[in-house]
Amino acid sequence: MGEKGCESCREWQEHCYREHMDVSRIRFFRLMTGDFAHGISIPEKVADRFSGQITKGFNLKAPSGETWRVSVEKVADELILMSGWEDFAKAHELQENDLLFFTCNGRCNGSFSFDVLIFDASGCEKVSCFFIGKKNSIGGQTQNAEQYHLSDSEDTSTPSTFLVGSPHKASTSKKLNGKTKTNPRKEPEDPNSSRSHVKHEMIEEEKSDDDDEHADYEHADYYYSRFANYLTGEEREEIFSLVSLQPGNPVFVTVLQAPQIHRKGLLIVPSGFAADHLDSRSQEILLMRPNKKEKWYVKYYHASTTRGFNCQRWIKFIRENRLREGYICIFELMKGARRVTMTVHVIGKVDDRFVLLG
């Protein structure tokens, strides 16, 4: 009797789920195994629940906030995410045993939309996926952003782990006497919220840029990260006296912090430098060291609110060059190179004096 009752309950639950539950509450996950790079199947129960309503495909909203259109095709009684999925998988660098969690959030442009969370084999969210976007995203606007889908002009929150070494923000960027200045747009915010706390730090950073009495006004194409802005005029003069820069090459200076050299760290490129000298898209950048033959191809991520290096190849560059917290790095953009190339000059401190490190 008990077993029959349980079976009846299960049938009733299945009926409620299939016939009465709002589809916007449907969730499912997929483990990336087999030939996942070219397409993945939708669980049978989920496919049945939509009852032919997803023939137009899905809109997948990635952790970065970008939306991807993916078509759905029926193959051997299975619904498979096909056209558009390969681009999604490639852009997010999906690997074997990555796990994707899909949550339906209603319709968008006539198609169902799903929020997608992406986890790696360790069970943690893949940080790089917050910085992945696509070109020609939904809505007809060209998007090359591969970071958080925020706008510099909005001056909204940025994860605190990315604030260390945070750059000038290109809210309204303009050059004053050769120095990039920014005018962030301020909006009311709850002073007790974490967003307000982060924003306060970012605004303070802007103040440090604007009020820097030691600003190097002589060089229009020199940019400084948040912590590099604390360098005095004498320190800057001493640092640049140690390196040989080609005339006309723009540079940005950063002081390495612990989070930037962690295995999942992010080195932010000053937004003024990015806006003035780099294409508004994610791309590979070649890093070189002076007087060395080695080359490092590092992924540069570009988005509305954050731009920087964040990948295993960046970590490899750190390790192979034995970079440490507190080191000063001068990234020199090599004008005239066939591909985007930066020479990285590294400076440390020994006995309270700056020294150029090989």
Swiss-Prot record:
Subcellular location field: Nucleus
An annotated GO cellular component: nucleus
Primary location recorded for the protein, binned into one broad class: nucleus
Classification via PROSITE patterns: B3
Any single Pfam family the record assigns to this protein: B3
MF-aspect GO terms: DNA binding
Residues of the DNA-binding region: 25-122, 252-350
Acidic residues compositional bias, start-end: 203-215
Name used for this protein in its record: B3 domain-containing protein Os12g0592300
InterPro entries, alphabetized: B3_DNA-bd, DNA-bd_pseudobarrel_sf, REM16-like
Biased composition (Polar residues): 156-181
Source organism: Oryza sativa subsp. japonica (Rice)
UniProt keyword annotations, A-Z: DNA-binding, Nucleus, Repeat, Transcription, Transcription regulation
Disordered: region residues: 148-215
